[in-house]
């Protein structure tokens, strides 16, 4: 059934990457960091997937959008 109980072990609690590493500012020019939070299709990954806190998710979204606007990151990934 779709709504039945889950089988298996306990889920691991997701930890915010930025809080854990003491990062207070997300720079839009740091494309290697931003790429970690973008899917293979080029979409921004949601909080429930990455475990990022709400504060840093907002900062991350703004940084990714700025990087896209400045052509540092693609809006969509190349089709192979």
Curated annotation (Swiss-Prot):
It comes from the Bacteria. Keywords: Ribonucleoprotein, Ribosomal protein, RNA-binding, rRNA-binding. Gene3D superfamilies: Ribosomal protein S18. GO terms for molecular function: small ribosomal subunit rRNA binding; structural constituent of ribosome. HAMAP family: Ribosomal_bS18. Binds as a heterodimer with protein bS6 to the central domain of the 16S rRNA, where it helps stabilize the platform of the 30S subunit. Part of the 30S ribosomal subunit. Forms a tight heterodimer with protein bS6. This is Small ribosomal subunit protein bS18. It comes from Staphylococcus epidermidis (strain ATCC 35984 / DSM 28319 / BCRC 17069 / CCUG 31568 / BM 3577 / RP62A). The gene is rpsR.
